[in-house]
């Protein structure tokens, strides 16, 4: 959830690289930032402050920021309030060491108590300071090398971590370690880079090593990258080549990343379908289904595990798979699944689909490990190539929508739904559970989605005007049925994430079982009321809302003349198959949330208290 950056080399000053890296990681969410640098005089300088990276830059403007080795961090508070004192890096008591850390040390209180009894003092409320004090204590008392002290300390630690450590007595070395929290090492010519993901690294090198759980990396000037485990057994990490276009992690003329990513969706869907959807041959090809045909064809049950927006995509996947493959599907919050003693295993013909944009979502990764331990076959749907979930699964499909920087997911959602649609079509065709005519019709419609979304994006100005009308609403209700119900959930989530307006998504038919009590002139209701599905039923719901003075924004099929007469505002969508409607209907809801948040003056790309990649529980 926080951001880690590191640099060691002889060619460049570390500070500019660290600051630029932190800026690349701002999308992950944070409340404070800091850097640690070793200068040529072997002084270890730590500078940190509450607030944004820009605040850190201002704080450092009159400080000694020289040096070719350094680490930097953006913090999202878990232990201790957001403050300069609790910000990272943390010194050890001797001030020989500085550490940055993502994750949670679960037994920090016990370790801290023991260290206090041994005479150690603490400056912050964080679990991270406990870890650096432990390393310092071990190193001093046992007269060990930094690596040995780190290994012994990590042996005592319970919890998740990604850490990077500097020692002013060893200014030519950075040590980093990982357990259940992502960490990437970039390898340059005589220099090393470090990041929570590849985005702070790719400007300087495309050669990276994704550290696995239990890995400890030693980056030392003049030497090759060394990776060992806690027992000091040397490992042979795979050096990968990453392909990230720098333009994808810059705004490119848009005021916010979120708006850029909304407008990128037509191209993203083309990228997602390239080489997979062949409308000219009416065929969908997924390598994972070819390589694991028998396992997937023999599935008796599919369990989808995900969190947040990915969970909403999973709900759409459930309907697609059940409709076309005739396989029962259950959709679980990964956080509930992992602790719920689920009945899952290979003996029951279970396939578990794990969905995560980052591929690092802690609860989803834990759910994967649990299902795997019980013998289930695991299929991953992720965006970040080389991330932890794809490496933990049996097979899977990348959505290929490029880096998503805005905290509120947009293009990743439509990418996930596109992959789930392709998965359902390919599996249904292999099973023979879909007619040839229907199969061809859905493929043709899917291939047309990029141009359909381009058409919907033309409503941007209309939606911006509409947003101004509802800027001061305190609550919203979103309604949908069938395939549109998960879209209603996603629309409500987008609004609450970035505008801080309370919003709920509900099945339209359930309105009378509670939510209708909330309807009055102060309650805007967004209703998805296209000609697909249960049009007449949703129209009746809208009439019930209007009878109670509710204000209705309706998403309707192009040319609808009935609902437009009773709704306060309508947004027209092109006609399409019901199963493809989520890909299109979600776009105006993304735009509505975006424009309301902008009107309210909110930080759209970095909403409060949220992180892009949730790598802790």
Predicted regions and their residues:
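Conserved short alpha-helical segments that host acidic/polar catalytic motifs at enzyme active sites
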Residues: 1-251, 255, 267-300, 339, ...
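Hydrophobic alpha-helical scaffolding
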Residues: 8-11, 101, 121, 139-143, ...
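Glycine-rich oxoanion-binding loops at beta->alpha junctions
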Residues: 68, 72-85, 280-293, 317-318, ...
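Structural motif
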Residues: 69, 97, 301-303, 351, ...
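Extended hydrophobic-aromatic, low-complexity segments
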Residues: 186, 313-315, 330-332, 362-365, ...
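Generic C-terminus detector
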Residues: 258, 551, 564-566, 576-617
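Active-site phosphate/pyrophosphate-binding segments
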Residues: 265-269, 273-303, 395-524, 597-617
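Glycine-rich phosphate-binding loops that contact phosphosugars or nucleotide phosphates
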Residues: 297-441, 445-448, 528-569, 592, ...
